Amino acid sequence: MATIKFPIVFSVVCLFLLCNGSLAQLLSQSTSQWQSSRRGSPRECRFDRLQAFEPIRTVRSQAGTTEFFDVSNELFQCTGVFVVRRVIEPRGLLLPHYSNGATLVYVIQGRGITGPTFPGCPETYQQQFQQSEQDQQLEGQSQSHKFRDEHQKIHRFQQGDVVALPAGVAHWCYNDGDAPIVAIYVTDIYNSANQLDPRHRDFFLAGNNKIGQQLYRYEARDNSKNVFGGFSVELLSEALGISSGVARQLQCQNDQRGEIVRVEHGLSLLQPYASLQEQQQEQVQSRDYGQTQYQQKQLQGSCSNGLDETFCTMRVRQNIDNPNLADTYNPRAGRITYLNGQKFPILNLVQMSAVKVNLYQNALLSPFWNINAHSVVYITQGRARVQVVNNNGKTVFDGELRRGQLLIIPQHHVVIKKAQREGCSYIALKTNPDSMVSHMAGKNSIFRALPDDVVANAYRISREEARRLKHNRGDELGVFTPSHAYKSYQDISVSA
């Protein structure tokens, strides 16, 4: 009898473990976007006075400039973000480097090429050439001295693209266009990938790293080198199989060009060229691809098995300015485009996301708060009136943001934005790959979710006033038309 019962008991135990594991997977899947592995601030923070920021320092390189925001300000230190704005001139090359935090780059202007180098990935871009008969005869004798150009995949970017750069991944950038590249870089220092102290560190593979280190008062202002500069010439030449002279060149001891250098005759790169139609098709396909990946993850669970998308094939850039990709659109108010880990899978690695908002003349956003992220708002066009309120009901910011200014909005703080007469566009870079907001008005808002009696008793108003409060903006989502235009539209609807 015991031998008969054992398989039954064993089967029951296995079934229990299977069900328990499936339940745990479902629970983790449903709560993953609410949770974050991001570290909090090690200091006590008081977000009682927010301010608009502009760069406080500009450092000139040979072929561009790097503009730094005030990293010593409490808002940057408490939210754990580091922000720079770079201008790369035509034929300018941002030297290869990596940092200790994950970074999102938004391209405000221009176009160019970038090349993140993922460890362990093959050099899939290879140069093909024909050999002469003499070369073929000598091939066996000089095989070790014959090389061809090969490198990892390079990525073209343009205005409106968001480029994701994981922590510790070396990358470079080159401007092959006719106009300067202007881009805003936001690095999340409190990202779980950073196991160093909570401050930004750039590790340059070339040039002299004299720029970023000077932002910290307790860092030496001289003798800053690239990572090769700390090795002895003998060990470096032996490790890389090069001469001592070349090893000294790698250390760039007398290189005063800065982090953006000029390539006089342009870069010669192995790259495929796509037609305009192919580029447009790629935008649509990338959107569909992200949605398909999300649906597959919903079916398979939140645990990654490493086969869905590897380092070597993942996309590192996605356009967020294309009107055809808008998630919310109001022809009288504007549009909103979300870029999260569901659409752009690499964001799950960098643990950040982006939102692009275009508001028309005098349009406004529904009051909202960020549920699971801090938000770095950068104005790209126009002006906007912005108010932010903290947990005590205190107005911690009430002012106008204009083009080129930046505002950090802490998690859970309630914000309202209204475009001025010329309209407004901004990019919001957030510290969660699946950032969520809670709206206070319109469709899917907190008021619409509350019963009439709860609203009436909470604010000591009548039921009729409560219903009006819930449904006044009931046909709009996210972006609202100006009050005069909205009333006119309501009057037309009623008369019709």
Swiss-Prot record:
<dbReference type="InterPro" id="IPR050253">
    <property type="entry name" value="Seed_Storage-Functional"/>
</dbReference>
<protein>
    <recommendedName>
        <fullName>Glutelin type-A 3</fullName>
    </recommendedName>
</protein>
<dbReference type="InterPro" id="IPR006044">
    <property type="entry name" value="11S_seedstore_pln"/>
</dbReference>
<dbReference type="GO" id="GO:0048316">
    <property type="term" value="P:seed development"/>
</dbReference>
<keyword id="KW-1015">Disulfide bond</keyword>
<dbReference type="InterPro" id="IPR006045">
    <property type="entry name" value="Cupin_1"/>
</dbReference>
<feature type="signal peptide">
    <location>
        <begin position="1"/>
        <end position="24"/>
    </location>
</feature>
<comment type="subunit">
    <text>Hexamer; each subunit is composed of an acidic and a basic chain derived from a single precursor and linked by a disulfide bond.</text>
</comment>
<dbReference type="InterPro" id="IPR022379">
    <property type="entry name" value="11S_seedstore_CS"/>
</dbReference>
<feature type="disulfide bond" description="Interchain (between acidic and basic chains)">
    <location>
        <begin position="121"/>
        <end position="312"/>
    </location>
</feature>
<feature type="domain" description="Cupin type-1 2">
    <location>
        <begin position="318"/>
        <end position="467"/>
    </location>
</feature>
<feature type="domain" description="Cupin type-1 1">
    <location>
        <begin position="50"/>
        <end position="248"/>
    </location>
</feature>
<dbReference type="GO" id="GO:0045735">
    <property type="term" value="F:nutrient reservoir activity"/>
</dbReference>
<dbReference type="Pfam" id="PF00190">
    <property type="entry name" value="Cupin_1"/>
</dbReference>
<keyword id="KW-0732">Signal</keyword>
<keyword id="KW-0708">Seed storage protein</keyword>
<comment type="similarity">
    <text>Belongs to the 11S seed storage protein (globulins) family.</text>
</comment>
<comment type="function">
    <text>Seed storage protein.</text>
</comment>
<dbReference type="InterPro" id="IPR014710">
    <property type="entry name" value="RmlC-like_jellyroll"/>
</dbReference>
<dbReference type="InterPro" id="IPR011051">
    <property type="entry name" value="RmlC_Cupin_sf"/>
</dbReference>
<keyword id="KW-0758">Storage protein</keyword>
<feature type="disulfide bond">
    <location>
        <begin position="45"/>
        <end position="78"/>
    </location>
</feature>
